[in-house]
């Protein structure tokens, strides 16, 4: 009886911590998405040893199922758009006036020559629902005490990474660092969040650096210039037709 009680308490404790870890990730994601929706304007810098390229991006999102993004610069790429509706992802290329439905196999490919994958951009996979979550040892990042949350893909989840380790500020639920590992356990990328400030009533990291570990002198920097939360967008906004006309 005593052994059964001990086992039950252990299972309940493990369940509590797993739920707690999942809730931490959910709250951290809400910082970028809003509870309902978000509109964002950002600058993206692609840095390479011998050159640098800058892009402008506008994005609209509603929950985890709907998002629409359009490039605003450089001029040659302006109007290029990406749409996510549930598990469907579309790309509009204005130079050839063609919309392309992107298959799951394209999610791992680089987005527009950056260090981000297509999945990073449209977030076809969800760090909340497609992974299991466990708490590791607390860490200090940029002088702030952070939870260390280990995300492991669920067996049937169509995700890019074999494991993700996220470090979330315990005060404001801001993700200050993330490590992305491949299926063999090798560290591929680091994501660093900085320049934490309040925007539209929410404290968040406004500068995100994605750094490939084995590519010296290479990284992608995303800077949030404007963000508005909980705007109203209906289903008709997130359509292939609107993707072709959004600016």
Language model features: what each stretch is:
Residues 40, 67-71, 89-93, 99-101, ...:
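Short hydrophobic/aromatic-rich beta-strand segments that constitute the beta-sheet cores
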Residues 18, 122, 142-239:
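Gly/Pro-enriched, hydrophobic low-complexity segments
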Residues 42-76:
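N-terminal, post-signal-peptide region of Sec/Tat-exported proteins
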Residues 19-37, 43-46, 52-53, 78-81, ...:
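Flexible, processing/modification-adjacent segments and terminal tails
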Residues 9-18:
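Hydrophobic h-region of N-terminal signal peptides that target proteins for export
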Residues 63-64, 86-87, 200:
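Residue-level signal for tight coil/turn positions that link beta-strands
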Residues 1-7:
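Positively charged n-region of N-terminal signal peptides that target proteins for export
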Residues 57-61, 81-82, 136-138, 194-196:
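Short, exposed beta-strand/loop patches in secreted or surface proteins that constitute
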């Amino acid at each position: 009886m005593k052994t059964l009680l001990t086992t039950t308490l252990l299972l309940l404790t493990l369940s509590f911590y797993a739920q707690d870890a999942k809730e931490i990730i959910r709250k951290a994601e809400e910082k970028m998405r809003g509870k309902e929706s978000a509109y964002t304007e950002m600058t993206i810098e692609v840095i390479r040893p011998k050159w640098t390229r800058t892009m402008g991006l506008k994005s609209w999102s509603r929950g985890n199922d709907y998002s629409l993004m359009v490039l605003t610069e450089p001029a040659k790429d302006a109007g290029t758009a990406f749409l996510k509706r549930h598990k469907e992802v579309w790309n509009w290329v204005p130079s050839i006036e063609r919309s392309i439905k992107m298959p799951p196999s394209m999610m791992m490919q680089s987005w527009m020559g950056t260090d981000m994958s297509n999945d990073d951009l449209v977030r076809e996979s969800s760090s909340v629902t497609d992974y299991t979550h466990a708490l590791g040892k607390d860490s200090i990042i940029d002088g702030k005490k952070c939870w260390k949350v280990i995300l492991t893909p669920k067996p049937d989840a169509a995700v890019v990474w074999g494991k993700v380790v996220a470090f979330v500020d315990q005060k404001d639920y801001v993700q200050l660092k993330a490590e992305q590992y491949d299926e063999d356990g090798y560290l591929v990328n680091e994501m660093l969040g900085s320049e934490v400030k309040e925007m539209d009533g929410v404290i968040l990291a406004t500068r995100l650096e994605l750094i490939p570990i084995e590519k010296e002198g290479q990284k992608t920097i995303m800077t949030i210039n404007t963000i508005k939360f909980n705007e109203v967008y209906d289903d008709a906004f997130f359509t292939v037709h609107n993707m072709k006309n959004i600016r």
